[in-house]
């Protein structure tokens, strides 16, 4: 692997002007392209401290064998050149917004004598008008099926058209009046083109004129007593209205805009785009991309900049549109945040469009509501992507094998346990322990712990807390193993389900009678060393321990001799890293939910909770009857027994708990004059 010091530019040789740079590998292939306001500042950051770089960036620098740059005069030129180089070289370390499929569009071949309507995928061609993209081809076919009743335009291929012209007989669509049958001369070329142009006007949003004209024709036919034609026109108007209902007005001002939203985590980001034309959503597209890991390249502003550059650059290359409704670059692009290069991007997009383009962050009204809808779609897309990846058996097997190879384990970690600590400024310190078996969560084995020794009185020590949880968990394992009839029980998820053990033996304790293959703690070297020291103290040597640091997704292994080892770096697209991240995030979620529950109970605790035999229902009845604890404290035994279900003994216990007998009430109760509702 090349040494970065061998190709680092000489001090002072890098210009300070804006420009675009590219790294090449030993074979001359471009592996990364970037731009910078100051080439010197940006390039020096790659060589200053390799250990401080994100894993993906560090891998890129270690893979490269040379770096070169081009100075430009403006940031707009840098933006354009960066896009061109990424498009030309397809560098492996750059973020690429690739569709997982080619989205279909509705194409109208206006360059033919008899234009036709068709589902199309591929590069744009001159003389063809495009509508879309659509998320599915069936959505286009459904639209055609509905609208060809109103606009009976040709949808057949050139071969079918020629064959029916030769036999002088229309196809089935011609017989059922869903095609005007120009192949047999039922309409002229000019009449057929007029039908097609009306169809295009309808999809372009010019619906009011078409419906108004049809209503006039329907009324005229009715006055002439041509009821059959009037009924047909009525049905056509109904079909057009149904088609319009499928495209609900989302922006009342008839705006043409693209609405962009992101959802991301540490490794990946999902982007969704709604194409709004004439105030109606005409199409939707989505991507899931791998983030670079470099802090400056994982911000929302950077993701927006990269997406706009690549997406609209690609759209412009596919071919511009002849009118406003199908122009690939709209007048307005609504984004979640404005990038640092907003002015340069607006200038570049305006050049692509041929007129002014503005970038905006929606603040209120319909645009804000639509942006939130697109955001929810992005979140759903990211969730579905992760669930699909996690649920795939092949991916899970590859993930377990990847972890085994990276950590040098003897076997694949079929059972993984992970610990996470949660607290707020040292209060309500809790821990969670989650279990994954065969790469899937086993929620029946989840546990939570209230930290006893390592926390209290507003103090918290995460390292000591990790040690405490590890000790308690594996003490339980050793105790259950000793209690098993045959010494150490069978290791595996079904060890607790053997029929001969009986209902008591197969209950909760036996689930921890076998250890995990891999024990994960949330944190770096201090946390993982604390867990490893506990296992060493207990004499457990068959459990691998690692720590997963959140900042750079580094995997730490224990080193009890006091030296700081280098972390294990997984490739960012590794199934193994994805599984470890999912385990860690699940532990974090479970810990937070328990912490919030415990904190909520503490904040709503009442002196009545300590009264023996007084349940929640009767506590609510007392509070509802008297209105506050202060008034309840001032009541007599007879007044309290007037509440249904409260006897004299319970009433005296209530007054004793509130300090009424001694005349000294607890400080958090005696001054409580607030109203309390049940």
Curated annotation (Swiss-Prot):
It comes from the Bacteria. Residues 208-243 form the UVR domain. Residues 477-508 are annotated as: Disordered. One of its GO terms (cellular component) is excinuclease repair complex. Residues 16-95 form the GIY-YIG domain. Keywords: Cytoplasm, DNA damage, DNA excision, DNA repair, Excision nuclease, SOS response. Residues 479-491 have a biased composition (Basic and acidic residues). It is found in: Cytoplasm. InterPro entries: GIY-YIG_endonuc, GIY-YIG_endonuc_sf, GIY-YIG_UvrC_Cho, Hlx-hairpin-Hlx_DNA-bd_motif, RuvA_2-like, UVR_dom, UVR_dom_sf, UvrABC_protein_C. GO terms for molecular function: DNA binding; excinuclease ABC activity. CDD domains: GIY-YIG_UvrC_Cho. Its main location: cytoplasm. GO terms for biological process: nucleotide-excision repair; SOS response. Interacts with UvrB in an incision complex. Belongs to the UvrC family. The UvrABC repair system catalyzes the recognition and processing of DNA lesions. UvrC both incises the 5' and 3' sides of the lesion. The N-terminal half is responsible for the 3' incision and the C-terminal half is responsible for the 5' incision. PANTHER family: UVRABC SYSTEM PROTEIN C, UVRC/OXIDOREDUCTASE. This is UvrABC system protein C. It comes from Mycolicibacterium vanbaalenii (strain DSM 7251 / JCM 13017 / BCRC 16820 / KCTC 9966 / NRRL B-24157 / PYR-1).
């Amino acid at each position: 692997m090349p040494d970065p010091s061998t190709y680092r530019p000489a001090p002072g040789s890098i210009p300070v002007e804006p420009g675009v740079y590219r790294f090449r590998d030993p074979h001359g292939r471009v592996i990364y392209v970037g731009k910078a306001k100051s080439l010197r500042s940006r390039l020096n950051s790659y060589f200053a401290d390799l250990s401080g770089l994100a894993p993906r960036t560090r891998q890129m620098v270690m893979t490269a064998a040379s770096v070169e740059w081009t100075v430009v005069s403006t940031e707009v030129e840098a933006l354009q050149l960066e896009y061109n180089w990424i498009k030309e070289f397809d560098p492996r370390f750059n973020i690429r917004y690739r569709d997982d499929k080619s989205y279909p569009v509705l194409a109208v071949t206006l360059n033919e004598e008899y234009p036709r309507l068709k589902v199309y995928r591929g590069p744009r061609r001159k003389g063809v008008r495009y509508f879309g993209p659509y998320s599915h081809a069936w959505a286009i076919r459904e639209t055609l099926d509905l609208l060809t009743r109103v606009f009976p335009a040709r949808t057949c291929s050139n071969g079918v058209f020629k064959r029916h012209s030769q036999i002088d007989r229309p196809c089935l669509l011609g017989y059922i009046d869903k095609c005007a049958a120009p192949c047999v001369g039922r309409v002229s070329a000019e009449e057929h083109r007029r039908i097609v142009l009306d169809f295009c006007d309808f999809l372009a949003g010019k619906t009011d004129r078409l419906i108004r004209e049809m209503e006039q024709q329907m009324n005229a036919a009715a006055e002439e007593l041509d009821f059959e034609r009037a009924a047909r026109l009525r049905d056509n108007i109904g079909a057009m209205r149904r088609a319009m209902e499928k495209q609900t007005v989302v922006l009342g001002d008839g705006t043409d805009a693209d609405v962009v939203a992101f959802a991301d985590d540490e490794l990946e980001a999902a982007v969704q785009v709604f194409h709004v034309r004439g105030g109606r959503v005409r199409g939707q597209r989505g991507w899931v991309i791998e983030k670079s890991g470099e802090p400056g390249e994982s911000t929302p502003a950077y993701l927006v900049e990269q997406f706009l550059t690549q997406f609209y650059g690609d759209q412009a290359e596919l071919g511009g549109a002849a009118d406003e409704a199908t122009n690939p670059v709209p007048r307005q692009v609504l984004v979640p945040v404005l990038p640092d290069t907003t002015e340069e991007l607006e200038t570049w997009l305006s050049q692509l469009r041929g007129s002014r383009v503005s970038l905006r962050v929606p603040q209120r009204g319909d645009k804000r509501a639509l942006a939130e809808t697109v955001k929810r779609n992005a979140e759903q897309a990211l969730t579905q992507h992760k669930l699909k990846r996690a649920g795939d058996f092949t991916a899970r097997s590859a993930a377990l094998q990847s972890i085994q190879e990276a950590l040098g384990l003897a076997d694949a970690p079929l059972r993984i346990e992970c610990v996470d600590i949660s607290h707020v400024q040292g209060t309500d310190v809790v821990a969670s322990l989650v279990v994954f078996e065969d790469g899937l969560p086993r929620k029946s084995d989840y546990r939570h712990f209230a930290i006893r020794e390592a926390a209290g009185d507003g103090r918290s020590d995460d390292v000591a807390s990790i040690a405490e949880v590890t000790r308690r968990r594996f003490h339980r394992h050793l105790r259950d193993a000793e209690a098993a009839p045959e010494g150490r029980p069978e290791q595996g998820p079904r060890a607790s389900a053997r029929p001969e053990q009986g209902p008591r033996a197969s209950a909760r304790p036996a689930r921890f009678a076998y250890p995990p293959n891999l024990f994960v703690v949330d944190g770096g070297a201090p946390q993982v060393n604390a867990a490893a020291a506990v296992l060493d103290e207990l004499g457990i040597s068959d459990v691998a321990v690692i720590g997963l640091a959140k900042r750079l997704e580094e995997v730490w292994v224990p080193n009890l001799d006091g030296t700081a080892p280098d972390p294990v770096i997984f490739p960012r697209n590794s199934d193994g890293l994805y599984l470890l991240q999912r385990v860690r995030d699940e532990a974090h979620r479970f810990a937070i939910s328990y912490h919030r529950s415990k904190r909520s109970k503490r904040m709503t605790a009442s002196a009545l909770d300590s009264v023996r035999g007084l349940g929640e229902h009767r506590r609510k009845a007392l509070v509802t009857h008297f209105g506050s604890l202060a008034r309840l404290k001032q009541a007599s035994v007879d007044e309290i027994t007037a509440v249904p279900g409260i006897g004299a003994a319970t009433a005296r216990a209530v007054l004793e708990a509130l300090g009424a007998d001694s005349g000294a009430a607890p400080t958090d109760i005696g001054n409580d004059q607030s109203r309390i509702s049940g």
